[in-house]
């Protein structure tokens, strides 16, 4: 063992060899290193290796001074916030990887590597550098897979580099998450790095010395695949599975998987994924004799360790090697549950795969595309994805079961392009950049405003899949303007006037139009310094270029045909060059084509910059600058054709120029078309907004337009049959009827002209909708299927607030933009702990969000519904459409009585919980809270409250959840166990309840407050507190004092509000505001009965109970307007919040949120949206009248 003494005289063990290590050395070598040493010394076949020790890691952290910086980043981190966790990890890893390795440690690693090379008889041995955490393989908490492994590392300096990367992998998002969850101090867990000779495996896999699925201790399970073991360990390859009887070594079961891909080393020593040869795809990887030989080694390993082991193995040149062994940490303790037999279950089997973790669970399907969507999964859901990774741990902990396939259908061909903030990039280029951690933005559509916007790309995926080749066509259906997309890819499409999600195959089958865009917004302005030279840049580059030497621009060449029509233009370009210090001289004249040149530095650098960045400049330039640039191209090599359109000609190989022109024209709201003449010439042409360009051209005059009689083509065409179905009730001289019936497109301007001549009820509303469409950035195009094949497809995931904004714009071969949604995609892994079925191949295709399924993790079966239910009939599959979300300024929340309905309530899309009733949680316990305190103690009541509140807070996180303290009347508590002593009141609704009772039973109130405090400390910062039935500010003051006693500072640590349920509270609302509150919630149920003196539970008078009584509404209006004046938020949580006609008034008065019952959320959201629109319209009308 190499021991270094530091400046303080402490002994530092930097390097340890396997013969120096045993299982007792986890604190020195980490789990992997200690285990390898144990196996080496037990005489097991292990490749030679050395370990860079945990002391070395600590030395590195100390000498580089990184500890304080890391602590600062981790301070206050909420690990349940996926974005925050990921960002913290990136910052820490960057700090570690960019730090300078201490020289003494660097030399120690190099010396050890050179010694390993001597042992292996190689000049530079190829090694694997594997992280080995000091808490990694402890039985209490599986840390496996949380740190990194690097294969095919060669050379001493590279080993040093990748050891440092291993150090940084101690702070991956999932490692940070696990340590927080398991209560490990981040700096008490150290990391070692194992540097081991890499076995170039012909076949490899894993072995479990106990069947981890059935937990049968008499069985040993081997998984095997072709090539390196990386595919099996990560789960990206479906392995063969062999089950061996440990007593007889009889092979009792085999599952021979179809193995599509394998990991191999290429000639450069790098790992790559290749296709398995056809004759090996379904061939058994290990022979029966090899299975038994490996099983014997496994038995020896288990015997040596004295416990069930999880072993990684490899096979090279006729010999097995053990790469790693660790205890199986996932075996359940205690009595096993009785397993259901497949034949006993009366349910339809939807899928079969390989059982990966035992157990049976029923729940709602939630399909996850990637780790950014893990918050979608709630407690008890069935997580369905292509493949899972340890990064999905937060979602897995909530899931009742997990179902995976080997890869769902991602979306777009690799050569298709998207427009990013770096210009046009192919999908396969974007994939590489994103996977390398590059930040990119992509053009997309805002589903609410129908305006284009830039969106951040947060992930990318790829695989192979079936692809449709679709062509964009207009009048001529024979199109070469194509793109390849998977048939189940979803597009935003108008169906019956609503923006909807429709699969490509359904679009084709039903001849639906899709959306294109006619405008690209600027990302940011940064080329104002080029404003004066944009025209010159376009003119020169239209048919010229910049000569470079060693990449630097040294001269400008400008080529033009010497015609009478171009003489003035050429002279003006010469004059413009002189203005920036250049001087064009003629250097050649062939067939009347003259080439001019200037070798001056400034024009060469300026025009050279424009040439290099021509494809991205339009993204960052103003419209005036872009118009000048394009005008230069038009004058230089363009014309105004007889078809009354402008044409620009470019060599088809000048891709950057073509793309710059395309982007520039869209930036100006001009829709360009691209056509190729033969293979060498590209023509970019357009015939709308011609004046924008022609008023800036110098050769082609604007007044030439007068020579053309043909009107400009109306480019914004829409499919009224899909977007404006209400037009079927209107017509103008048969035109609209024909357009609608035959699904023809019509120009928006022409449609406006027709409708202006129609005088009929309802037409004004349609005109308003058309106005919005005219101001939008969308129009309709038609597509058709022209071919089909199988090949690579790619997908990106964009950051968005809601699912309809998870879209982006993809471009065809001829640069026609089409709006598409994100599709299903994720990364692979196998996961433990909950019922899990892997290798189904088609889970993400067969299962749908919202389906109820039962997962049998041992049998590897997914059943339809609950296992006792059998569906008699299958519904005919139709085009499935989803309505776009309605966005409102007024929040629409939901009332929740019981934690059990939290998932259903959250699924409504509500903006939060406006009222979470404490009393229903208490009643659900079946025992009086006083009895719980007396018999079980304070902790029992706190835990019971936490459990209920947590379910709701978790389901809605990060949306707010407003918890109302206990408000149960005495008659409700009397029925509980221990409730015999509840006082008998003639009218409990006017009796001992609400804040009166809370302040009389402070010990129960404190339990509620302590439960909330602990939950907020767990990370549920979305919980708010509200007190009921207040009548005087003194009550608020007293509750605040009690909150401080339990460690909660109202209005500072936690949002704090009151229920306004009494006329007293409504009338003196300003006094409550002065006392200090964050929000008010109107409880109209009680407010109504107290205002009009009617007991709503009394059948004799309940018919007179009216929430819209003028006196009640007057009090409500007074509260809302008073609070608004003081900046206090208002909400309503009574039944009135579910009454549309009352909600209209609330919105008009300015209420901040409305909390409705679960079944009324959708209706109320529509009422709120309609009312908000009406309020805005009335304001506009009023303003207009006042101006007039």
From Swiss-Prot:
Mg(2+) binds at residues 1061, 1086. Pfam families: LAGLIDADG_3, PEP-utilizers, PEP-utilizers_C, PPDK_N. InterPro entries: ATP_grasp_subdomain_1, Hint_dom_N, Hint_dom_sf, Homing_endonucl, Intein_C, Intein_endonuc_central, Intein_N, LAGLIDADG_dom. This protein undergoes a protein self splicing that involves a post-translational excision of the intervening region (intein) followed by peptide ligation. Pathway: Carbohydrate biosynthesis; gluconeogenesis. Its EC number is 2.7.9.2. The active site is at 824 (tele-phosphohistidine intermediate), 1133 (proton donor). Its cofactor is Mg(2+). GO terms for molecular function: ATP binding; endonuclease activity; metal ion binding; pyruvate, water dikinase activity. Coiled coil: none annotated. GO terms for biological process: gluconeogenesis; intein-mediated protein splicing. Substrate binds at residues 917, 964, 1061, 1083-1086. Belongs to the PEP-utilizing enzyme family. Catalyzes the phosphorylation of pyruvate to phosphoenolpyruvate. The N-terminal domain contains the ATP/Pi binding site, the central domain the pyrophosphate/phosphate carrier histidine, and the C-terminal domain the pyruvate binding site. This is Probable phosphoenolpyruvate synthase. The lineage of its organism: Archaea, Methanobacteriati, Methanobacteriota, Methanomada group, Methanococci.
């Amino acid at each position: 063992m190499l021991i270094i003494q530091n400046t303080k005289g402490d002994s530092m063990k930097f390097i340890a060899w396997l013969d120096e290590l045993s299982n007792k050395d986890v604190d020195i070598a980490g789990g992997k290193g200690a285990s390898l040493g144990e196996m080496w010394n037990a005489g097991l076949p292990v490749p030679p290796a050395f370990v860079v020790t945990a002391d070395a890691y600590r030395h590195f952290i100390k000498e580089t001074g990184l500890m304080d910086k890391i602590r600062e980043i981790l301070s206050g981190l909420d690990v349940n916030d996926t974005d925050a966790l990921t960002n913290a990890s990136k910052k820490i890893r960057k700090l570690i990887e960019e730090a300078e390795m201490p020289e003494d440690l660097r030399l120690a690693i190099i010396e050890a590597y050179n010694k390993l090379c001597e042992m292996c008889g190689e000049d530079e041995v190829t090694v694997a550098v594997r992280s080995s955490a000091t808490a990694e393989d402890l039985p209490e908490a599986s840390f496996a897979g949380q740190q990194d492994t690097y294969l095919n590392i060669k050379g001493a300096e590279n080993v040093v580099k990748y050891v440092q990367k291993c150090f940084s992998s101690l702070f991956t998002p999932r490692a940070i998450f696990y340590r927080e969850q398991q209560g490990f101090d981040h700096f008490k867990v150290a990391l070692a790095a194992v540097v081991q000779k890499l076995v170039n495996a012909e076949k490899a896999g894993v072995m479990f010395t106990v069947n981890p699925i059935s937990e049968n201790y008499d069985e040993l399970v081997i998984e095997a695949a072709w090539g390196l073991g990386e595919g099996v360990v990560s789960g990206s390859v479906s392995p063969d599975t062999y089950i061996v009887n440990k007593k007889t070594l009889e092979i009792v079961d085999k599952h021979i998987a179809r193995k599509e891909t394998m990991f191999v080393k290429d000639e450069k020593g790098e790992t790559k994924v290749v296709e398995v040869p056809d004759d090996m795809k379904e061939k058994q990887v290990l022979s029966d004799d090899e299975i038994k030989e490996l099983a014997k080694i496994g038995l020896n390993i288990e015997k040596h360790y004295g416990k069930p082991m999880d072993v990684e193995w490899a096979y090279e040149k006729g010999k097995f090697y053990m790469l790693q062994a660790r205890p199986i940490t996932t075996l359940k303790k205690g009595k096993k549950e009785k397993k259901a037999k497949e034949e006993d279950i009366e349910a339809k089997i939807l899928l079969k795969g390989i059982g990966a973790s035992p157990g049976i669970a029923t729940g709602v399907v939630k399909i996850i595309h990637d780790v950014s969507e893990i918050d979608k999964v709630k407690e008890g859901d069935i997580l369905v994805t292509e493949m899972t990774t340890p990064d999905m741990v937060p979602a897995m902990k909530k899931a009742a079961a997990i179902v995976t396939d080997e890869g769902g259908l991602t979306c777009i061909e690799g050569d298709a392009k998207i427009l990013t903030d770096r210009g046009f990039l192919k999908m396969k280029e974007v994939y590489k950049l994103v996977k390398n951690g590059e930040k990119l933005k992509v053009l997309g559509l805002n589903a609410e405003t129908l305006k284009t916007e830039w969106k951040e790309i947060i992930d990318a995926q790829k695989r192979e899949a079936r692809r449709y080749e679709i062509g964009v066509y207009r009048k001529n259906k024979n199109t070469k303007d194509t793109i390849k997309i998977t048939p189940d890819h979803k597009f935003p499409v108008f169906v019956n006037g609503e923006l909807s999600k429709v699969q490509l195959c359904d679009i084709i089958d039903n001849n639906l139009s899709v959306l294109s865009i006619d405008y690209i917004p600027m990302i940011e302005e940064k080329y104002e310094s080029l404003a004066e030279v944009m025209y010159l840049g376009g003119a020169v580059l239209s048919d010229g270029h910049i000569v470079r030497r060693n990449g630097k621009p040294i001269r400008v060449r400008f080529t033009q045909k010497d015609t009478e029509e171009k003489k003035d233009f050429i002279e003006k370009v010469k004059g413009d060059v002189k203005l920036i210090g250049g001087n064009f001289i003629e250097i050649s004249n062939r067939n009347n084509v003259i080439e001019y040149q200037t070798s001056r530095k400034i024009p060469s650098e300026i025009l050279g910059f424009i040439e290099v960045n021509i494809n991205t400049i339009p993204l960052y330039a103003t419209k005036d600058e872009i118009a000048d640039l394009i005008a230069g191209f038009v004058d230089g090599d363009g014309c105004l054709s007889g078809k009354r359109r402008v044409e620009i000609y470019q060599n088809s190989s000048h891709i950057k120029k073509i793309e710059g022109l395309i982007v520039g024209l869209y930036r100006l709201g001009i829709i360009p078309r691209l056509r190729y003449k033969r293979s060498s010439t590209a023509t970019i042409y357009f015939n709308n907004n011609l004046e924008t360009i022609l008023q800036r051209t110098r050769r082609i005059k604007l007044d030439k337009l007068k020579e053309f009689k043909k009107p400009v083509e109306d480019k914004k065409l829409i499919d009224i049959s899909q977007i404006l179905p209400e037009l079927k009730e209107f017509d103008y001289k048969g035109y609209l009827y024909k357009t609608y019936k035959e699904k023809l497109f019509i120009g928006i301007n022409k449609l406006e002209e027709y409708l202006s001549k129609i005088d009929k009820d309802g037409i004004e509303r349609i005109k308003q909708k058309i106005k919005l469409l005219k101001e939008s950035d969308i129009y309709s195009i038609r597509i058709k299927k022209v071919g089909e094949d199988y090949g690579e497809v790619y997908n990106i995931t964009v950051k968005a607030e809601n699912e309809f904004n998870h879209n982006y714009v993809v471009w065809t071969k001829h640069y026609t933009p089409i709006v598409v949604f994100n599709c299903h995609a994720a990364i692979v892994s196998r996961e433990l702990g909950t019922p899990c079925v892997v290798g189904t191949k088609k889970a993400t295709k067969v299962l749908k969000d919202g389906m109820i399924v039962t997962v049998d993790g041992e049998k590897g079966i997914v059943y339809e519904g609950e296992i006792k239910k059998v569906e008699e009939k299958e519904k005919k599959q139709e085009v499935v459409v989803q309505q776009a979300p309605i966005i409102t300024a007024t929040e629409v929340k939901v009332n929740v009585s019981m934690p059990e309905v939290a998932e259903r309530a959250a699924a409504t899309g509500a903006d939060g919980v406006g009222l979470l009733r404490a009393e229903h949680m208490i009643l659900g316990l079946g025992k009086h809270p006083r009895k719980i305190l007396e018999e079980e103690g304070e902790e029992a009541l706190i835990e019971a409250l936490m459990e209920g509140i947590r379910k709701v807070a978790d389901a809605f996180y990060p949306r707010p959840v407003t918890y109302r303290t206990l408000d149960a009347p005495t008659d409700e508590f009397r029925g509980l166990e221990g409730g015999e002593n509840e006082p008998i009141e003639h009218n409990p609704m006017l009796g001992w309840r609400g804040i009166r009772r809370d302040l009389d039973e402070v010990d129960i109130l404190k339990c509620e407050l302590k439960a909330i405090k602990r939950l907020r400390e767990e990370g549920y910062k979305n919980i708010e507190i509200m007190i009921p039935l207040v009548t005087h500010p003194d009550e608020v003051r007293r509750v605040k004092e009690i909150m401080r006693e339990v460690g909660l500072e109202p209005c500072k640590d936690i949002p704090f509000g009151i229920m306004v349920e009494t006329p007293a509270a409504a009338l003196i609302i300003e006094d409550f505001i002065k006392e200090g509150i964050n929000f008010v919630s109107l409880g109209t149920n009680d407010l109504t009965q107290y205002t009009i003196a009617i007991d709503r539970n009394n059948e004799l008078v309940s018919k007179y109970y009216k929430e819209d009584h003028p006196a009640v509404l007057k009090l409500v209006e007074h509260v809302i307007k008073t609070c608004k004046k003081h900046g206090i938020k208002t909400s309503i949580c009574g039944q009135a919040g579910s009454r549309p006609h009352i909600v209209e008034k609330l919105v008009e008065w300015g209420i901040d949120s409305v909390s409705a019952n679960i079944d009324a959320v959708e209706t109320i959201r529509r009422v709120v949206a309609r009312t908000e629109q009406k309020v805005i319209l009335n304001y506009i009308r009023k303003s207009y009248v006042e101006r007039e």
